[in-house]
Amino acid sequence: MAGHSKWKNIQRRKNAQDAKRGKLFMKLAKEIYVAAKTGGGDPASNPALRLVIEKAKAANMPNENIERAIKKATGTQEHTNYEEVRYEGYGPGGVAVMVVCLTDNKNRTASNVRVAFSKNGGNLGETGCVSYLFDRKGLLVIAREGLDIDEDDMLLQAIEAGAEEMETTEDSFEIYTTPEAFEEVKEQLEKNGFTFASAEITMIPQTYTTLAGDDLKKMLKLIDTLEDDDDVQEVYHNLDESVLEE
């Protein structure tokens, strides 16, 4: 993980999504709906719902949109049955790609994902072909701006809260947890007075692939095409995006 700021990748993804705010709100509403339908509409007793509500608020999603999605999931009207489906494959230059979808029509989604890969120099693979290249982790990002704490003290508080490790960048402290400990670590750090620029359970690449030229352009187009699809919730990849800062 050293030398590759996951938070930088998240910022780039959020900036891209901000330009497509309506589509982002629709995807967040779907995620809220599924979380509420699965675990109930009370965020206090449903950690998954609580987390996605926080994510929605961070994206400036209106409260009425959030409440509407919860009411739709917990009401008596006919429900939409969304199923989580994951696709794995390779982008240009052998970049590993995982695509997480929520869909009510697997045939439509599979076709769209397959076309996105084939049109942008990639290949859709079998389940498990790249997932072993990622680790599922909780990631809590604390912005350093205006924060009066040094790296050693921050690390001590993170470890005492139950975190696995912490990385320090120029802009942030990036705290990693197991998925199981994520909620507990988050709550403890909140009790300690910290707020988060980002808080999510995500897939962290074990290694990164560097691209340039046409391969890089095609890979970025593949990511954009997948993220534009209404059924796609997340696109994880191991492209070294630090080159985009140069």
Curated annotation (Swiss-Prot):
Gene Ontology molecular-function annotations: DNA binding
Disulfide bonds: none
Protein name: Probable transcriptional regulatory protein GWCH70_2524
Keyword presence, Transport: no
GO BP terms, alphabetized: regulation of DNA-templated transcription
Bilayer-spanning residue ranges: none
GO cellular component, one term: cytosol
Origin species: Geobacillus sp. (strain WCH70)
Signal sequence region: none
Alphabetical UniProt keywords: Cytoplasm, DNA-binding, Transcription, Transcription regulation
Subcellular location: Cytoplasm
Keyword DNA damage tagged: no
Domain of life: Bacteria
Family, as annotated: Belongs to the TACO1 family.
